[in-house]
């Protein structure tokens, strides 16, 4: 990568992506490599997180580093009015790496511009989630044996879903076909569709979630409707249960179909799907550890073969 920070997946070339995925595979084979001894990482989570924060902290610990940080911004000086710039500059005095989640779009990029310490974007509003994209790409390649020429169906909150926005960019190097399934209120934004058009990516939009669409699919990417992104709770109530994947909907699906979900789920995947061998979302979350270990080493310029 040209930058030592990872704030957006569009920083990564095809070669960058494949190198990070190859390194993630090496970490899956042996996650306990003491490559960060003597280094400290800060996890600054201004928004709630379970998987992303814990997997990043586990990644640092398994690499021999130490972690400081917070998961509740109300306990920090930002609750007293401290600016994001000042928070970043203060934390930069203590650490070698900052991993940050923030509700404002562009916050991670801004942080990377005010400090020389590498920044990893762990999610900025509805904008980007590049480390999730890497673990998604790792999961796709692991289950499909390839990344090229796959049909990916994205279902649910495509308007505010930063994971689907990032995944479109990450997959753009590999000639995918997309199906976007969403109610009109949560349809894929024009920015992402224009990106597809510019890069020659095929896509279709749907408001109905049907077995016919599922049967054309290699990767079924389910998402929850995010209550925290709505200012109108009546609108949220109207759309929150609009699509629910049930096990019987998979009866004629492709053998290679795998179901992904960035988690947490609410009601969009019925629990009877969990025992289907095509359900991969729990393993997908586990892959986050290896992908994030690879990302950390990438931004710090550490060779994992040392």
Curated annotation (Swiss-Prot):
Domain of life per record: Bacteria
GO cellular component: cytosol
Summary of the function given for this chain in its UniProt record: Catalyzes the condensation of carbamoyl phosphate and aspartate to form carbamoyl aspartate and inorganic phosphate, the committed step in the de novo pyrimidine nucleotide biosynthesis pathway.
EC category name: transferase
Gene of this entry: pyrB
Record has Transferase as a keyword: yes
PROSITE patterns named among the record's database cross-references: CARBAMOYLTRANSFERASE
Assembly: Heterododecamer (2C3:3R2) of six catalytic PyrB chains organized as two trimers (C3), and six regulatory PyrI chains organized as three dimers (R2).
Residues given in the record as L-aspartate binding sites: 80, 162, 224
Keyword Transferase annotated: yes
Protein name: Aspartate carbamoyltransferase catalytic subunit
Cited Pfam families: OTCace, OTCace_N
E.C. code: 2.1.3.2
MF term (GO), any: aspartate carbamoyltransferase activity
The reaction(s) this protein catalyses: carbamoyl phosphate + L-aspartate = N-carbamoyl-L-aspartate + phosphate + H(+)
UniProt keyword terms in alphabetical order: Pyrimidine biosynthesis, Transferase
Swiss-Prot/TrEMBL GO biological process terms: 'de novo' pyrimidine nucleobase biosynthetic process; 'de novo' UMP biosynthetic process; amino acid metabolic process
Lineage of the species this protein comes from: Bacteria, Pseudomonadati, Bacteroidota, Bacteroidia, Bacteroidales
PANTHER family with a match to the protein in the record: ASPARTATE CARBAMOYLTRANSFERASE (PTHR45753:SF6), ORNITHINE CARBAMOYLTRANSFERASE, MITOCHONDRIAL (PTHR45753)
UniProt-annotated binding residues for carbamoyl phosphate: 51-52, 101, 129, 132, 263-264
Metabolic or biological pathway: Pyrimidine metabolism; UMP biosynthesis via de novo pathway; (S)-dihydroorotate from bicarbonate: step 2/3
Family: Belongs to the aspartate/ornithine carbamoyltransferase superfamily. ATCase family.
């Amino acid at each position: 990568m040209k930058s030592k920070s990872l704030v957006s997946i569009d920083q990564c070339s095809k070669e960058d992506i494949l190198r990070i995925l190859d390194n993630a595979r090496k970490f899956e084979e042996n996650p306990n490599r003491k490559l960060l001894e003597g280094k400290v990482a800060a996890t600054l989570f201004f928004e709630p997180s379970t998987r992303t924060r814990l997997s990043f902290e586990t990644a640092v610990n398994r690499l021999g580093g130490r972690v400081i940080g917070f998961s509740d911004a109300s306990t920090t000086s930002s609750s007293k009015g401290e600016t994001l710039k000042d928070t970043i500059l203060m934390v930069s005095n203590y650490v070698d790496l900052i991993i940050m989640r923030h509700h404002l779009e562009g916050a991670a990029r801004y942080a990377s511009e005010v400090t020389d310490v590498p920044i990893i974007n762990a999610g900025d509003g509805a904008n980007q989630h590049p480390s999730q994209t890497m673990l998604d790409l790792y999961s796709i390649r692991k289950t499909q044996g390839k990344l090229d020429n796959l049909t990916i169906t994205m279902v649910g909150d495509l308007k505010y879903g930063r994971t689907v926005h990032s995944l479109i960019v990450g997959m753009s190097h590999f000639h995918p076909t997309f199906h976007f399934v969403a109610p009109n209120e949560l349809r894929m934004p024009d920015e992402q569709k224009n990106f597809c058009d510019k890069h020659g990516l095929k896509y279709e939009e749907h408001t109905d979630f049907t077995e016919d669409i599922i049967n054309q699919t290699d990767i079924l990417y389910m998402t929850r409707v995010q209550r925290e992104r709505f200012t109108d709770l009546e609108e949220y109530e109207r759309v929150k249960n609009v699509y629910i994947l049930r096990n019987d909907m998979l009866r004629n699906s492709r053998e290679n179909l795998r179901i992904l979900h960035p988690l947490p789920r609410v009601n969009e995947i019925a629990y009877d799907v969990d025992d289907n061998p095509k359900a991969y979302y729990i393993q997908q979350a586990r892959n986050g550890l290896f992908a994030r270990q690879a990302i950390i080493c990438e931004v710090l310029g550490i060779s994992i073969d040392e």
